Amino acid sequence: MGLGSIPKGSTIFDETLPFPVRYLRATIITMLTTFAIYAVPQIGYNLCTIPAILILGQDPAQWPPAFDNPWRATSLSDFWGRRWHQFFRHIFLLGGYPLSLVFGRAGIVIGSFLVSAVLHYITQLTLDGQVEFWRMLVGFGMMAPGILAERAYYQLTGRRVGGVVGWVWTMVWLLVWGNMIVEGFARAGMFGSVSFDDNALPAGLMVERLAMDFDVWLHAI
């Protein structure tokens, strides 16, 4: 889905398309990438959960859901604090603790997303493309102001962000900055790396053909 022109990497932004269509294409790629990122750890978690319960006799309560329908989040706090996976929660909070000594609770939020940016940057170093830390820093870093804005809204109005408006706000904010994050991984070579599903025929060929047809349709608009 990415385009070339970047050494060993690609980009989700097709410069040959008008800006609105170009951004629409990039956003769709970001959405599909997010669902893939959701599906892979979910599958791995399930593959561990089933034998742990059926064979080892562990209590299902020991294996709570890895995700809680993240697409239903009605605020950024809801998305990151509960609905997205919490595998690295303690690492992020520990990393945010130093800033809390200066900025209080806001420092924990800011520091946690800074740590997240660093960890995702480290994963990019395993790829062969153009690695740019600033994309992770801005992409994940901007989640903190969004959450702090929700807290400020609650303090001013006494109402929490939620409902349909909250859902729209959450999805727009995630997609705007998510584009930057996915672009960073695309430039680092994520879309060109070998994965377990590269030989998953005929599904792989079908997805590739659909992506090509979609690009042709976008250029025909």
Residue map of PLM features:
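Membrane-helix and juxtamembrane interface regions of eukaryotic multi-pass membrane proteins
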Residues: 1-77, 81, 102
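Membrane-lumen (extracellular) interface motif
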Residues: 2-30, 102-103, 121-138, 152-161, ...
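Alpha-helical transmembrane segments and their membrane-interface exit regions
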Residues: 141-150, 195-200
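Transmembrane alpha-helical segments that form the membrane-embedded catalytic/substrate-channel core
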Residues: 39-54, 148, 152, 176-184
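Transmembrane alpha-helices of multi-pass eukaryotic membrane proteins
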Residues: 22-45, 105-113, 131-143, 161-175
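Membrane-interfacial catalytic/cofactor-binding modules of polytopic membrane enzymes
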Residues: 53-124, 160-221
